[in-house]
Amino acid sequence: MRLTQGTFSFLPDLTDAQIQKQVQYAVSKKWAVSVEYTDDPHPRNSFWELWGLPLFDVKDASALMYEIAACRKAKPNYYIKVNAFDNTRGVESCCLSFIINRPINEPGFHLERQEVQGRNILYTIKSYAVNKPEGSRY
């Protein structure tokens, strides 16, 4: 099951040239850009691991592409995404986020039902990937 989070999530995977154009767009807007990765793809997992530090005041997309390549090399079977933050209003608001790397096999999610007091049923989804320990999920 293909994970659909962020901008461009329903499109085919972006090429490196397309990623560079998106990163260059963020740089031209003077947005801070960060690279994050995770092996827990749950939609509510908003705390991905940060690769290095966010890059502020970068003038050229090649520095960001270097960080992306380094992250891909170190974490080839992880989800990796690029985030761009706009602080012009005095807050760090994410204005662009897209996945740039995926594991070869995306196992998907299962629905878990739990009966609670009063015969109410609670539903939650869990990724099949989290059945394995962190760091060895893919």
UniProtKB/Swiss-Prot annotation:
It comes from the Eukaryota. One of its GO terms (biological process) is reductive pentose-phosphate cycle. The keyword Chloroplast applies. Keywords: Calvin cycle, Carbon dioxide fixation, Chloroplast, Photorespiration, Photosynthesis, Plastid. SMART domains: RuBisCO_small. One of its GO terms (molecular function) is ribulose-bisphosphate carboxylase activity. The keyword Cytoplasm does not apply. It is found in: Plastid, Chloroplast. Signal peptide: none annotated. Pfam families: RuBisCO_small (PF00101). One of its GO terms (cellular component) is chloroplast. Belongs to the RuBisCO small chain family. RuBisCO catalyzes two reactions: the carboxylation of D-ribulose 1,5-bisphosphate, the primary event in carbon dioxide fixation, as well as the oxidative fragmentation of the pentose substrate in the photorespiration process. Both reactions occur simultaneously and in competition at the same active site. Although the small subunit is not catalytic it is essential for maximal activity. Heterohexadecamer of 8 large and 8 small subunits. In this alga, in contrast to plants, the small subunit is encoded in the chloroplast. This is Ribulose bisphosphate carboxylase small subunit. The gene is rbcS.
